[in-house]
């Protein structure tokens, strides 16, 4: 199995939207009201919103592909594109979405490695992300990747307020090895 990580282009927006909704639904659908999910999809994953994010200079998007099929994607932010003010030495992993049928095949690890490469190339010393407090599977994965909880923040999903844990990973020269 070959995992390729490729930049997402504007021509990929429909596919980006489809994968965003599919992965969000698989992860959060069983635990949330349908109306809240639909409101989130319309707000966060409409093509115009995704285009705006894709064209934001301090944001980067990458598809992970397995044998040519999109398996998931990574979205990173630096500077003023970060969803929280975490300082100038940080890179945010805003989204790391892996389709259900591709989970536990090393794709998430490959996307984290890509984020580390981007952070190091930009001379950042830390990577951070938010993960839903009830997503224990993702929390365990991030722990294995060296992330530690440093705080929390609130996340609105439709009308419901939820709590995300803020996880941080410090980088050093050996991080990529």
How should these model regions be labeled?
Residues 99-101, 105, 133-134:
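Active-site acidic-Proline motif in GNAT/NAT acetyltransferases
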Residues 105, 122-125:
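Short coil/turn segments at alpha/beta junctions that flank glycine-rich nucleotide-binding fingerprints
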Residues 97, 147-148:
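Short acidic-aromatic loop segments in the C-terminal HATPase_c
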Residues 104-117, 140-144:
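Conserved acetyl-CoA-binding loop-helix of GNAT-fold acetyltransferases
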Residues 68, 72, 106-108, 146:
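Conserved phosphate-binding and hydrolysis motifs of nucleotide-dependent enzymes
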Residues 87-91, 125-128, 132-139, 143-145, ...:
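C-terminal "cap" of GNAT-fold acetyltransferases
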Residues 2-4:
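Extreme N-terminal starter segment of soluble prokaryotic enzymes
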Residues 7-13, 17-30, 38-101, 112-114, ...:
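Acetyl-CoA-dependent GNAT
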């Amino acid at each position: 199995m070959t995992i390729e990580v490729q930049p997402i282009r504007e021509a990929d927006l429909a596919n980006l939207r489809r994968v965003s909704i599919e992965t969000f639904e698989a992860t959060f659908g069983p635990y949330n009201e349908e109306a809240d999910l639909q409101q989130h999809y319309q707000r966060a994953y409409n093509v115009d919103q995704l285009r705006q994010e894709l064209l934001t200079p301090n944001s980067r998007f990458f598809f992970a592909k397995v044998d040519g099929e999109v398996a998931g994607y990574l979205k990173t932010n630096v500077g003023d594109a970060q969803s929280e003010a975490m300082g100038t030495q940080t890179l945010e992993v805003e989204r790391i979405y892996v389709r259900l049928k591709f989970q536990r095949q090393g794709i998430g690890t490959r996307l984290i490695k890509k984020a580390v490469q981007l952070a190091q190339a930009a001379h950042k010393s830390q990577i951070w992300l938010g993960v839903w407090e009830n997503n224990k599977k993702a929390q365990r994965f991030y722990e294995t990747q060296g992330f530690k909880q440093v705080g929390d923040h609130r996340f609105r999903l439709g009308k419901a307020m939820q709590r995300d844990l803020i996880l941080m990973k410090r980088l050093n020269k050996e991080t990529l090895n």
